[in-house]
């Protein structure tokens, strides 16, 4: 993994760990403070998380984007220079908003996909590909809530959320 930077914060009895793999000059204190209301929103929405710890494990890269949910963690890939730097304004630029949205999306999956799921995902036949018709609802609902959660926690304005919906 190389250089790893870890920060921990607590929300409603759950410890959240923000791990960056790769060098960063980002304002990690700000990122943690921005993630706190987002995590609380999700915990309140689903009446808590059965796990005591949740991990945001982020591979910082030059150019790349994505996430993969797990039961108590997510593996993220995000460009290092799109995170907020120390001494920047409190305004959330679009690129940083995408990081918060990605975190929101993958955390939402801790319930919607990892705990709320169809039978085919509970006991999958791993000897062959498994197709399901419900994937659109899992990704669709999660995609709806990732940015909606940013608006509900006031990390972005209602106007910004309306612009996202318009895209």
For each of these PLM feature ranges, what is it?
Residues 1-6:
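Conserved alpha/beta core surface patches that mediate binding of polyanionic ligands
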Residues 8-134:
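Juxtacatalytic substrate-recognition/specificity segment
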């Amino acid at each position: 993994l190389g250089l790893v930077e870890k920060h921990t914060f607590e929300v409603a009895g759950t410890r959240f760990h923000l791990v960056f793999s790769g060098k960063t000059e980002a304002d990690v204190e700000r990122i943690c403070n921005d993630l706190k209301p987002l995590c609380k929103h999700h915990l309140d929405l689903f009446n808590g998380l059965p796990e005591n710890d949740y991990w945001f494990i982020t591979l910082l890269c030059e150019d790349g984007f994505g996430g993969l949910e797990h039961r108590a963690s997510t593996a993220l890939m995000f460009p290092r220079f799109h995170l907020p730097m120390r001494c920047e304004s409190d305004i959330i630029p679009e690129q940083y908003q995408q990081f918060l949205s990605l975190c929101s999306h993958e955390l939402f999956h801790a319930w919607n996909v990892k705990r709320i799921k169809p039978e085919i995902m509970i006991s999958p036949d791993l000897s062959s590909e498994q197709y399901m018709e419900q994937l659109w609802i899992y990704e669709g609902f999660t995609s709806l809530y990732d940015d909606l959660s940013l608006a509900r926690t006031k990390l972005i304005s209602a106007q910004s959320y309306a612009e996202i919906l318009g895209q």
